[in-house]
Protein backbone atom coordinates (compact mmCIF):
# COMPACT_ATOMS: atom_id res chain seq x y z
CA UNK A 1 0.00 0.00 0.00
CA UNK A 2 1.07 3.55 -0.72
CA UNK A 3 -0.47 6.73 0.66
CA UNK A 4 -0.46 9.67 -1.74
CA UNK A 5 -0.55 13.24 -0.43
CA UNK A 6 -0.15 16.68 -1.96
CA UNK A 7 2.75 19.02 -1.28
CA UNK A 8 2.26 22.38 0.45
CA UNK A 9 2.89 25.82 -1.02
CA UNK A 10 4.90 26.95 1.99
CA UNK A 11 8.34 25.39 2.21
CA UNK A 12 11.40 25.66 4.38
CA UNK A 13 15.01 24.55 4.53
CA UNK A 14 15.93 22.25 7.41
CA UNK A 15 19.35 20.68 7.21
CA UNK A 16 19.61 19.96 10.93
CA UNK A 17 16.66 17.79 12.06
CA UNK A 18 16.77 14.73 9.79
CA UNK A 19 19.07 14.00 6.88
CA UNK A 20 17.74 13.14 3.42
CA UNK A 21 18.62 9.61 2.30
CA UNK A 22 18.16 9.82 -1.47
CA UNK A 23 17.80 12.08 -4.45
CA UNK A 24 14.34 12.28 -6.04
CA UNK A 25 13.86 9.57 -8.69
CA UNK A 26 12.79 12.06 -11.38
CA UNK A 27 15.65 14.51 -10.89
CA UNK A 28 16.44 14.84 -14.60
CA UNK A 29 12.83 15.86 -15.24
CA UNK A 30 13.00 18.35 -12.36
CA UNK A 31 16.08 19.88 -13.99
CA UNK A 32 14.15 20.29 -17.26
CA UNK A 33 11.35 22.07 -15.40
CA UNK A 34 13.79 24.27 -13.50
CA UNK A 35 15.35 25.31 -16.81
CA UNK A 36 11.90 26.03 -18.26
CA UNK A 37 11.17 28.27 -15.26
CA UNK A 38 14.46 30.14 -15.56
CA UNK A 39 13.72 30.67 -19.26
CA UNK A 40 10.67 32.78 -18.36
CA UNK A 41 10.77 36.44 -17.42
CA UNK A 42 10.15 37.39 -13.79
CA UNK A 43 6.68 38.66 -14.70
CA UNK A 44 5.84 35.44 -16.57
CA UNK A 45 6.90 33.43 -13.50
CA UNK A 46 4.78 35.61 -11.19
CA UNK A 47 1.73 35.02 -13.39
CA UNK A 48 2.48 31.29 -13.54
CA UNK A 49 2.82 31.17 -9.75
CA UNK A 50 -0.36 33.25 -9.29
CA UNK A 51 1.05 35.02 -6.26
CA UNK A 52 1.76 38.43 -4.79
CA UNK A 53 4.86 40.42 -5.64
CA UNK A 54 6.34 39.66 -2.20
CA UNK A 55 5.89 35.90 -2.60
CA UNK A 56 7.23 36.12 -6.14
CA UNK A 57 10.40 37.81 -4.85
CA UNK A 58 10.98 35.01 -2.33
CA UNK A 59 10.54 32.40 -5.05
CA UNK A 60 12.74 34.29 -7.50
CA UNK A 61 15.56 34.06 -4.95
CA UNK A 62 14.85 30.38 -4.33
CA UNK A 63 14.98 29.68 -8.05
CA UNK A 64 18.22 31.63 -8.41
CA UNK A 65 19.88 29.63 -5.61
CA UNK A 66 18.28 26.26 -6.42
CA UNK A 67 20.68 23.32 -6.58
CA UNK A 68 18.61 20.21 -7.18
CA UNK A 69 21.56 17.88 -6.68
CA UNK A 70 22.67 19.24 -3.30
CA UNK A 71 19.44 20.02 -1.44
CA UNK A 72 19.65 19.40 2.31
CA UNK A 73 16.02 19.05 3.39
CA UNK A 74 14.06 15.79 3.29
CA UNK A 75 10.67 16.27 1.60
CA UNK A 76 8.76 15.34 4.77
CA UNK A 77 10.32 18.34 6.57
CA UNK A 78 10.40 20.75 3.63
CA UNK A 79 6.64 21.30 3.36
CA UNK A 80 4.86 23.41 5.98
CA UNK A 81 1.19 22.66 5.24
CA UNK A 82 -1.27 21.58 7.90
CA UNK A 83 -1.02 17.87 7.09
CA UNK A 84 2.75 18.02 7.56
CA UNK A 85 2.40 19.90 10.85
CA UNK A 86 -0.02 17.29 12.21
CA UNK A 87 2.17 14.44 10.99
CA UNK A 88 4.92 15.99 13.16
CA UNK A 89 7.82 14.10 11.58
CA UNK A 90 10.30 15.91 13.84
CA UNK A 91 9.04 13.98 16.88
CA UNK A 92 8.48 10.55 15.31
CA UNK A 93 10.62 7.58 16.29
CA UNK A 94 12.81 5.73 13.79
CA UNK A 95 10.27 2.91 13.28
CA UNK A 96 7.55 5.44 12.46
CA UNK A 97 9.83 7.33 10.08
CA UNK A 98 10.72 4.05 8.35
CA UNK A 99 7.00 3.35 7.91
CA UNK A 100 6.52 6.76 6.29
CA UNK A 101 9.49 6.20 4.00
CA UNK A 102 8.05 2.89 2.82
CA UNK A 103 4.38 3.84 2.49
CA UNK A 104 4.04 7.62 1.97
CA UNK A 105 4.46 9.35 -1.40
CA UNK A 106 4.17 13.07 -2.09
CA UNK A 107 3.00 14.38 -5.44
CA UNK A 108 5.00 17.34 -6.75
CA UNK A 109 4.77 19.70 -9.70
CA UNK A 110 8.57 20.00 -9.84
CA UNK A 111 9.71 16.53 -8.76
CA UNK A 112 6.77 14.38 -9.94
CA UNK A 113 6.69 11.98 -7.01
CA UNK A 114 8.70 12.06 -3.81
CA UNK A 115 9.55 9.70 -0.99
CA UNK A 116 9.62 11.35 2.46
CA UNK A 117 13.42 11.34 2.72
CA UNK A 118 14.20 12.49 -0.81
CA UNK A 119 16.20 15.72 -0.72
CA UNK A 120 14.32 18.73 -2.05
CA UNK A 121 15.03 22.39 -2.62
CA UNK A 122 12.29 24.93 -1.86
CA UNK A 123 10.27 25.75 -4.97
CA UNK A 124 6.90 27.00 -6.14
CA UNK A 125 5.34 25.00 -8.94
CA UNK A 126 1.86 23.58 -8.63
CA UNK A 127 0.83 20.62 -10.76
CA UNK A 128 -1.92 22.66 -12.44
CA UNK A 129 0.58 25.31 -13.62
CA UNK A 130 0.55 25.90 -17.38
CA UNK A 131 4.34 25.64 -17.68
CA UNK A 132 5.45 24.57 -21.14
CA UNK A 133 8.50 22.31 -21.02
CA UNK A 134 10.08 19.76 -23.34
CA UNK A 135 7.41 20.41 -25.96
CA UNK A 136 4.58 19.67 -23.53
CA UNK A 137 1.66 22.06 -22.97
CA UNK A 138 1.52 21.81 -19.16
CA UNK A 139 2.74 19.75 -16.22
CA UNK A 140 0.09 17.04 -16.59
CA UNK A 141 1.28 16.54 -20.15
CA UNK A 142 4.93 16.76 -19.10
CA UNK A 143 4.63 14.16 -16.32
CA UNK A 144 2.30 11.90 -18.28
CA UNK A 145 2.18 8.49 -16.61
CA UNK A 146 5.55 8.60 -14.83
CA UNK A 147 4.27 9.10 -11.26
CA UNK A 148 1.54 6.48 -11.78
CA UNK A 149 3.98 3.99 -13.30
CA UNK A 150 6.30 4.41 -10.32
CA UNK A 151 3.46 3.89 -7.85
CA UNK A 152 2.18 0.85 -9.79
CA UNK A 153 5.67 -0.66 -9.66
CA UNK A 154 5.65 -0.30 -5.86
CA UNK A 155 2.14 -1.43 -4.90
CA UNK A 156 -1.28 -2.78 -5.82
CA UNK A 157 -3.18 -0.32 -3.58
CA UNK A 158 -3.05 3.45 -3.27
CA UNK A 159 -4.84 5.40 -0.56
CA UNK A 160 -5.32 8.81 -2.14
CA UNK A 161 -5.29 11.70 0.33
CA UNK A 162 -4.05 14.14 -2.32
CA UNK A 163 -6.03 17.04 -3.73
CA UNK A 164 -7.81 16.63 -7.07
CA UNK A 165 -4.97 18.61 -8.64
CA UNK A 166 -2.42 15.95 -7.69
CA UNK A 167 -4.58 12.82 -7.88
CA UNK A 168 -5.42 13.84 -11.47
CA UNK A 169 -1.73 13.31 -12.29
CA UNK A 170 -1.92 9.68 -11.10
CA UNK A 171 -5.41 8.17 -11.33
CA UNK A 172 -5.94 8.26 -15.14
CA UNK A 173 -2.58 6.55 -15.76
CA UNK A 174 -2.83 3.63 -13.32
CA UNK A 175 -3.20 0.09 -14.64
CA UNK A 176 -6.51 -1.57 -13.70
CA UNK A 177 -4.79 -3.99 -11.31
CA UNK A 178 -3.95 -1.10 -8.94
CA UNK A 179 -6.69 -0.18 -6.49
CA UNK A 180 -7.14 3.55 -5.92
CA UNK A 181 -9.10 4.57 -2.83
CA UNK A 182 -9.80 8.31 -2.58
CA UNK A 183 -10.68 10.00 0.67
CA UNK A 184 -12.66 13.19 0.22
CA UNK A 185 -12.46 15.82 2.95
CA UNK A 186 -15.04 18.54 2.87
List the model feature ranges, each with a label:
Residues 4-91:
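Active-site helix-to-loop segments that bind/position phosphate- or nucleotide-bearing substrates
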Residues 89-186:
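Internal, well-folded beta-alpha domain core
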Residues 2-6, 157-160:
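Short hydrophobic beta-strand segments
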Amino acid sequence: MRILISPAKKMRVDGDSLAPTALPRFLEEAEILKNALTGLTAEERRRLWECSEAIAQVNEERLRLMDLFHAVTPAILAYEGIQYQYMAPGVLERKQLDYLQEHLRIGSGLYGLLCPFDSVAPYRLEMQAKLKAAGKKDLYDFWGGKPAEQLAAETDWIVNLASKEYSKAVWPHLPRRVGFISCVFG
